Structures are given as C-alpha cells and as structure tokens.
C-alpha cells in the first residue's frame, strides 16, 4: 500500500516552529531572571539604607490640564520619615514624621495635616522606600523593558486601597532608581526624576518635625 508522506518542507516548517517556540520560551525565562536579579539589586540597595537624600524634579499632569513642574531636595529616614524641600515653588514643604503628613504652602499661607495612612497624595508611593522594599509583595504584573543602559519596570499595586493604578521605575544596572512615574485612577500623572543620590547621609531627626508658622492657617483632614 502506498503511503503519502508530507513534503519535507512541512517537517522543516514544524521543526522551525518548535525551535522558535523553544527559543522564545528560553528568552522569556532569561528575561525574567534578569528582571528578578535587578529587582533584588534595587531592594538590596534601598533596604540596607537607613537614610537617603536626592535632588528631585517633579512633573504633575492632571487629566486634561497643563503640566505643573516643581523641584527641590528629598530626604528620607527610616522608619517612616520623609521631607520634601521645594526650591520651586520656593518655601513649599512636605513632611512626614512617620505618623502625620504635613503640607505647607507659603503662597497660600496654609498648612495641611493628615494621618499618613489616610493620605491620597501621590508622593505616598515613594513611602515604600522607607520600609522594607519588596516588589513581589507591593506590586503585581511586573514587567521590565530596556531603555538604553537602564531598565524601565512597569507594575501595578497589589492593593486597590491606594490613589494610583500604575507605577513605573527607571532603574540603573546597579539598582539605583532614576525615575518614578505614578499614574492615578483619575489618569493624572506624577513623574519624579532623581539625581545626586546620597545613601546614608547624616540627617538630623528634627528635619522631620513640623511646627506651624505663626499666622498660618491650619487645615486638618477629617475636621
């Protein structure tokens, strides 16, 4: 009995397809391994640090409105303390003492006070740097993409009880965070660029305390 066999090019096509699938699978595993290694480098860098200081540039773009740019110096101290000193606008201050957040705006002659956990300010995502940084615990759907010599890591928060829906980190090969982009549920975007990072500088605890200046209006959240 005569048996018809598929042409040789059919076998070649099947073999090539299987080879391609295999190569893609190996490539995906290698990419995942590289991303995992980079995430561990970032975690190690910031989990070991007790204090941190960086110069920041901040762009805030509300949905359908013009972008607003601000800049200054950010100082962090574990546990739970941070201080944003703004050069632009001059005198603006955002402080956390680990329990409360304070926002002082000289141009409005007003200071706002709120509990740290109740804050919906989108600077709050950076607070994870004040504790034990764990990407797998804090975020889901982590993806990495090369951007020059750096890697852009995209992620979503695991909990929905936060004012943002997505975060991106631009990270150097040695685990330094150069940029953080936060997208809110209202589609507003807050983009931070960091430079001149100093790990474990001496920071006085008084930097993270705030006294309302005389004559300034105090607004307390929930009051």
Regions found by a protein language model. Give the residues of each.
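N-terminal secretory signal peptides that target proteins for export/translocation
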Residues: 1-15
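Bacterial N-terminal signal peptides
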Residues: 17-27
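N-terminal leader/targeting segments and the immediate start of mature chains
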Residues: 27-68, 81, 212-223
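Gly/Pro-enriched, hydrophobic low-complexity segments
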Residues: 37, 112, 134-223
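Solvent-exposed strand-loop boundary residues in beta-sheet-rich modules
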Residues: 64, 107-109, 186
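Short, surface-exposed coil-to-beta transition loops
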Residues: 69-71, 89-90, 97, 162-166, ...
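An acidic-aromatic
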Residues: 73-124, 190-191
